[in-house]
Amino acid sequence: MHRITILGATGSIGESTLDVVRRHADRYVVHALTAHRQVRKLADQCVEFRPARAVVGTAEAALELETLLRDAGVKTEVSHGEAALESVAADAQTDSVMAAIVGAAGLRPTLAAARAGKRVLLANKEALVMSGRIFMDAVREHGATLLPIDSEHNAIFQCLPADDPRYGRGVARVLLTASGGPFRTRDPATLHDISPDQACAHPNWVMGRKISVDSATMMNKGLEVIEAHWLFGAPAERIEVLIHPQSIVHSMVAYTDGSVLAQLGNPDMRTPIAYGLAYPERIDAGVTPLDLTVAGGLHFEKPDLVRFPCLGLAFDALRAGGVAPAALNAANEVAVEAFLGGTVRFTDIAGIVRQVLEATPQGPADTLEAVLSADALAREAAREGVAALAAKR
C-alpha cells in the first residue's frame, strides 16, 4: 500500500485528492492530513480515512479536533503548529506528500518533504515561486521525486520527453494556457467595481477564493510562469501564455521541428492528481471523458497586459530574479486578502504589487533566510500600501 500525506486536506485540492484515494482504497492509505482552521471538516476526513496523524494550525484547533475524534472513537495523533507540519511532511512512514497548502505558508513543509526525499506532488506553486533554486537543489540533493499537480504544469510534464522532462532536447517553447478568468471580455473601465464574489466566480474551475482572485487578475498565470521556469528550466523568453477560454487544452509544448504537443481533458483537478499519484501508471480519476464533438471549437488569443497587468509584473519579477518573485508573491497575497476583506478595490491589487516590487531591495535568493526576509519586508510594504488606499476611500 502506498502511504500518502496531504498538506491542506480541507482545501479544493485536498478534497479532490481524497476523492481519488477513495476510488482506489486497494492502492493507497492516508497516513496524515493537515488543515489550518477547518477543524470539523478535517475531523470528518479523519473519521473516514483514519490517518495516523493530523496537524492543525493552533493549540485551540488541536484541542477541538482531539475532542471530536475522541467522541468518534478515532485514535489519530493530533498536533499543531509549523514544526508539526514540517515533521509530518518528512515523516518516515509516508511515501508521497501532496503539497496543497495555499500561499507562502506551504513553503517550509513542502521543502521539508523534498529534503526528506519524498515523492512530492506539488500543488503549492509558491514553494517554487519564492525559493525555486533552493527547492530544486533540495529535490536533486536528497533524491526526491517532484511531480507537478497544477493542471498546466502537469500537462507540460506529459508533453515533454518522458526520459528528461526539461527544456532542451528540441523544445522551442513552453505554452501555458489560461482561461482568462471571469473578466476576459469585460470593459476594463468597469473593473474597479468588481466585488469579491464576482472575482471568485470562475467560469470553468472550482477553486478556493484566493486562487480564484489570482485567476481573475491572471496573477495565477504569472506565478505559473515562474513555476514553469524552475520546473522545466525554460527561460522567460521561451515561456508563452495563451488565453484559451474553453480550458480544454491545459498546456502545450512546441518543438523545433514544428510539432506542437498538447494535453487535453475536461477541467477537473482529479486528472492531474490521479496522474501524480499513480505515475508512471494511469488510474481512473472519476473524471467525465472529454468528447471533442461536444466541446466544440477551441480558441486561443494573446493576453492583454493592459487588462491583466499582474501577468506582466510576474514576467518582470522572473527576469529580475533573486528575491523579486518572493516579493511579488508576498505583495499579491496581502493585496488579495485586502480585496477579499473589502479594504481595497480589485484594480488596486496590481498597483500594490507594482509599488512593492519597485521598493523591494534586490538580492540573491540563495538561502531560505534571505527569501523569508524579503517576504516579510514585502508584506509590510504591501500592508502600508493597503492602509494608504483604505485611508483615501
UniProtKB/Swiss-Prot annotation:
Pfam families: DXP_redisom_C, DXP_reductoisom, DXPR_C
Keyword match NADP: yes
Cofactor: Mg(2+); Mn(2+)
Annotated NADPH binding sites: 10-13, 37-38, 124, 126, 208
Gene3D superfamilies: 1.10.1740.10, NAD(P)-binding Rossmann-like Domain
Spans through the membrane: none
Name by which UniProt lists this protein: 1-deoxy-D-xylulose 5-phosphate reductoisomerase
Annotated source species: Cupriavidus necator (strain ATCC 17699 / DSM 428 / KCTC 22496 / NCIMB 10442 / H16 / Stanier 337)
